[in-house]
Protein backbone atom coordinates (compact mmCIF):
# COMPACT_ATOMS: atom_id res chain seq x y z
CA UNK A 1 0.00 0.00 0.00
CA UNK A 2 1.11 3.55 -0.74
CA UNK A 3 -0.98 5.15 1.98
CA UNK A 4 -3.79 6.35 -0.26
CA UNK A 5 -7.23 4.87 -0.74
CA UNK A 6 -9.10 3.62 -3.79
CA UNK A 7 -12.64 2.99 -4.96
CA UNK A 8 -14.49 -0.28 -5.67
CA UNK A 9 -14.24 -1.29 -9.32
CA UNK A 10 -10.95 0.52 -9.94
CA UNK A 11 -7.73 -1.51 -10.52
CA UNK A 12 -6.11 0.18 -7.50
CA UNK A 13 -2.65 -0.89 -8.60
CA UNK A 14 -3.37 -4.55 -9.32
CA UNK A 15 -0.76 -6.03 -11.65
CA UNK A 16 2.00 -3.81 -10.29
CA UNK A 17 4.25 -3.54 -7.21
CA UNK A 18 2.30 -3.96 -3.98
CA UNK A 19 4.16 -1.07 -2.37
CA UNK A 20 2.68 1.31 -4.95
CA UNK A 21 -0.85 -0.09 -4.91
CA UNK A 22 -3.87 1.53 -3.29
CA UNK A 23 -5.33 -0.37 -0.34
CA UNK A 24 -8.71 0.55 1.16
CA UNK A 25 -9.51 -1.34 4.38
CA UNK A 26 -7.74 -4.61 5.13
CA UNK A 27 -9.83 -6.82 7.43
CA UNK A 28 -8.00 -10.13 7.06
CA UNK A 29 -4.60 -11.59 6.19
CA UNK A 30 -3.36 -15.10 5.38
CA UNK A 31 0.14 -16.28 4.47
CA UNK A 32 0.58 -19.27 2.14
CA UNK A 33 3.38 -21.84 2.51
CA UNK A 34 5.05 -20.40 -0.60
CA UNK A 35 5.20 -16.96 1.03
CA UNK A 36 2.33 -15.38 -0.90
CA UNK A 37 0.21 -12.97 1.14
CA UNK A 38 -3.57 -12.80 0.79
CA UNK A 39 -5.50 -9.79 2.06
CA UNK A 40 -9.19 -9.16 2.42
CA UNK A 41 -9.65 -5.59 1.20
CA UNK A 42 -13.12 -4.98 2.57
CA UNK A 43 -13.94 -1.57 1.13
CA UNK A 44 -12.83 -2.74 -2.32
CA UNK A 45 -15.00 -5.89 -1.99
CA UNK A 46 -12.24 -8.20 -3.11
CA UNK A 47 -9.47 -10.48 -1.90
CA UNK A 48 -6.02 -9.64 -3.27
CA UNK A 49 -2.79 -11.63 -3.46
CA UNK A 50 0.81 -10.46 -3.21
CA UNK A 51 3.22 -12.96 -4.73
CA UNK A 52 6.84 -13.58 -3.78
CA UNK A 53 7.79 -11.19 -6.57
CA UNK A 54 5.99 -8.36 -4.77
CA UNK A 55 3.28 -8.01 -7.42
CA UNK A 56 -0.29 -7.54 -6.20
CA UNK A 57 -3.26 -8.94 -8.11
CA UNK A 58 -6.98 -9.45 -7.62
CA UNK A 59 -7.65 -12.98 -6.35
CA UNK A 60 -11.41 -12.94 -5.74
CA UNK A 61 -14.11 -10.36 -6.39
CA UNK A 62 -14.75 -7.79 -9.09
CA UNK A 63 -15.15 -4.90 -6.67
CA UNK A 64 -18.91 -4.78 -7.23
CA UNK A 65 -21.46 -5.93 -4.66
CA UNK A 66 -23.52 -9.02 -5.43
CA UNK A 67 -27.08 -8.24 -6.50
CA UNK A 68 -27.93 -11.48 -8.35
CA UNK A 69 -27.52 -14.97 -6.95
CA UNK A 70 -25.39 -17.06 -7.04
CA UNK A 71 -22.90 -14.15 -7.00
CA UNK A 72 -20.46 -15.89 -9.30
CA UNK A 73 -20.35 -19.27 -7.56
CA UNK A 74 -19.14 -22.09 -9.77
CA UNK A 75 -16.90 -19.88 -11.89
CA UNK A 76 -13.62 -17.95 -11.77
CA UNK A 77 -13.31 -16.22 -8.39
CA UNK A 78 -11.96 -13.08 -10.04
CA UNK A 79 -15.31 -12.67 -11.80
CA UNK A 80 -17.39 -13.28 -8.68
CA UNK A 81 -19.07 -10.66 -6.54
CA UNK A 82 -18.37 -10.44 -2.83
CA UNK A 83 -20.27 -8.60 -0.11
CA UNK A 84 -19.85 -4.99 0.94
CA UNK A 85 -17.28 -6.12 3.47
CA UNK A 86 -15.55 -9.50 3.13
CA UNK A 87 -13.67 -9.95 6.40
CA UNK A 88 -11.69 -12.94 7.70
CA UNK A 89 -9.82 -15.26 5.36
CA UNK A 90 -7.96 -18.53 5.95
CA UNK A 91 -6.01 -21.04 3.88
CA UNK A 92 -6.97 -24.70 3.85
CA UNK A 93 -4.64 -27.73 3.75
CA UNK A 94 -5.42 -28.19 0.04
CA UNK A 95 -4.31 -24.62 -0.88
CA UNK A 96 -7.90 -23.40 -1.03
CA UNK A 97 -8.82 -20.02 0.47
CA UNK A 98 -11.88 -19.55 2.68
CA UNK A 99 -13.59 -16.15 2.87
CA UNK A 100 -15.98 -14.93 5.57
CA UNK A 101 -18.32 -13.04 3.26
CA UNK A 102 -20.07 -11.11 6.00
CA UNK A 103 -22.86 -9.15 4.35
CA UNK A 104 -23.74 -12.15 2.17
CA UNK A 105 -24.07 -14.30 5.32
CA UNK A 106 -21.94 -17.17 4.07
CA UNK A 107 -18.49 -18.72 3.89
CA UNK A 108 -17.06 -19.04 0.41
CA UNK A 109 -14.15 -21.13 -0.79
CA UNK A 110 -11.77 -20.55 -3.68
CA UNK A 111 -10.24 -23.86 -4.73
CA UNK A 112 -6.74 -24.37 -6.04
CA UNK A 113 -8.33 -24.24 -9.51
CA UNK A 114 -9.56 -20.68 -8.90
CA UNK A 115 -13.25 -21.63 -8.78
CA UNK A 116 -15.35 -20.07 -6.02
CA UNK A 117 -18.23 -21.84 -4.24
CA UNK A 118 -20.30 -21.34 -1.12
CA UNK A 119 -19.46 -23.94 1.54
CA UNK A 120 -21.54 -22.65 4.46
CA UNK A 121 -24.54 -20.39 4.84
CA UNK A 122 -27.73 -20.00 2.82
CA UNK A 123 -27.45 -16.23 2.54
CA UNK A 124 -30.27 -15.38 4.97
CA UNK A 125 -29.80 -12.79 7.70
CA UNK A 126 -31.79 -14.36 10.52
CA UNK A 127 -31.10 -15.94 13.89
CA UNK A 128 -28.42 -18.66 13.55
CA UNK A 129 -29.89 -22.09 12.81
CA UNK A 130 -29.20 -25.31 10.96
CA UNK A 131 -26.74 -26.99 13.32
CA UNK A 132 -26.58 -30.73 12.65
CA UNK A 133 -27.46 -30.40 8.97
CA UNK A 134 -25.68 -29.49 5.72
CA UNK A 135 -23.59 -26.36 6.12
CA UNK A 136 -24.92 -24.81 2.92
CA UNK A 137 -28.50 -24.77 4.26
CA UNK A 138 -27.59 -23.30 7.66
CA UNK A 139 -28.30 -19.69 8.61
CA UNK A 140 -24.96 -18.00 9.35
CA UNK A 141 -25.61 -14.28 9.77
CA UNK A 142 -22.68 -11.91 9.28
CA UNK A 143 -19.71 -14.25 9.83
CA UNK A 144 -16.57 -12.33 10.76
CA UNK A 145 -13.78 -14.90 10.87
CA UNK A 146 -12.96 -18.37 9.61
CA UNK A 147 -10.21 -20.85 10.53
CA UNK A 148 -9.41 -24.14 8.78
CA UNK A 149 -8.07 -27.29 10.47
CA UNK A 150 -5.67 -29.81 8.97
CA UNK A 151 -8.47 -32.31 8.35
CA UNK A 152 -10.42 -29.83 6.22
CA UNK A 153 -13.01 -28.92 8.83
CA UNK A 154 -13.42 -25.22 9.52
CA UNK A 155 -14.60 -22.93 12.28
CA UNK A 156 -16.79 -19.84 11.89
CA UNK A 157 -17.05 -16.87 14.26
CA UNK A 158 -20.72 -16.00 14.08
CA UNK A 159 -22.92 -13.79 16.32
CA UNK A 160 -21.73 -14.73 19.80
CA UNK A 161 -20.73 -18.28 18.90
CA UNK A 162 -18.11 -20.35 17.13
CA UNK A 163 -19.55 -22.97 14.81
CA UNK A 164 -17.76 -25.94 13.29
CA UNK A 165 -18.25 -27.45 9.84
CA UNK A 166 -16.89 -30.99 9.72
CA UNK A 167 -14.82 -32.34 6.85
CA UNK A 168 -17.84 -34.11 5.35
CA UNK A 169 -19.91 -30.94 5.18
CA UNK A 170 -16.83 -29.07 3.98
CA UNK A 171 -16.76 -31.45 1.01
CA UNK A 172 -20.30 -30.61 -0.09
CA UNK A 173 -21.12 -28.25 -2.93
CA UNK A 174 -24.14 -25.95 -3.02
CA UNK A 175 -27.40 -27.90 -3.40
CA UNK A 176 -25.94 -31.24 -2.31
CA UNK A 177 -27.12 -33.29 0.67
CA UNK A 178 -25.89 -36.44 2.36
CA UNK A 179 -27.09 -39.60 4.06
CA UNK A 180 -25.07 -41.77 6.43
CA UNK A 181 -24.59 -45.50 5.88
CA UNK A 182 -26.29 -47.91 8.30
CA UNK A 183 -23.11 -48.44 10.32
CA UNK A 184 -22.16 -44.74 10.21
CA UNK A 185 -18.80 -45.35 8.54
CA UNK A 186 -19.64 -43.76 5.20
CA UNK A 187 -21.59 -40.79 3.88
CA UNK A 188 -23.40 -40.85 0.54
CA UNK A 189 -23.60 -37.49 -1.26
CA UNK A 190 -26.49 -36.72 -3.63
CA UNK A 191 -27.27 -33.73 -5.82
CA UNK A 192 -30.55 -31.79 -5.67
CA UNK A 193 -32.09 -34.23 -8.17
CA UNK A 194 -31.32 -37.19 -5.90
CA UNK A 195 -28.51 -38.62 -8.04
CA UNK A 196 -25.60 -40.18 -6.14
CA UNK A 197 -22.43 -38.13 -6.64
CA UNK A 198 -19.79 -39.75 -4.43
CA UNK A 199 -19.17 -41.66 -1.20
CA UNK A 200 -17.10 -40.16 1.62
CA UNK A 201 -15.40 -41.51 4.73
CA UNK A 202 -17.56 -40.28 7.62
CA UNK A 203 -14.55 -39.63 9.85
CA UNK A 204 -12.17 -37.90 7.45
CA UNK A 205 -14.44 -36.64 4.68
CA UNK A 206 -12.16 -38.23 2.09
CA UNK A 207 -13.64 -39.84 -1.01
Pin down the residues of each PLM region.
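Conserved beta-propeller blade signature
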Residues: 36-38, 96-99, 153-156
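Surface-exposed recognition patches
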Residues: 166-207
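Short loop/turn segments immediately following the C-termini of beta-strands
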Residues: 42, 102, 159
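Structural signal for beta-propeller blades
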Residues: 45-48, 105-108, 161-164
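Gly/Pro-rich loop segments of beta-rich domains
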Residues: 1-25, 54-85, 113-142
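Residue-level detector of Asp-centered blade-edge/turn motifs that repeat once per structural unit
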Residues: 31-34, 91-94, 148-151
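Blade-level signature of beta-propeller repeat domains, shared across WD40, Kelch, NHL, RCC1
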Residues: 142-168
Amino acid sequence: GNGSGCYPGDPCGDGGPASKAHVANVNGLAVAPDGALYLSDANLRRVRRIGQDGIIDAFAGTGFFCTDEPCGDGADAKLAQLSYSPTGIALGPDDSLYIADGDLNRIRRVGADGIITTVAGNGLSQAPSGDGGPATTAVIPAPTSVAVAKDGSFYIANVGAVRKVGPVSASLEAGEFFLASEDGSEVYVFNSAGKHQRTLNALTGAA
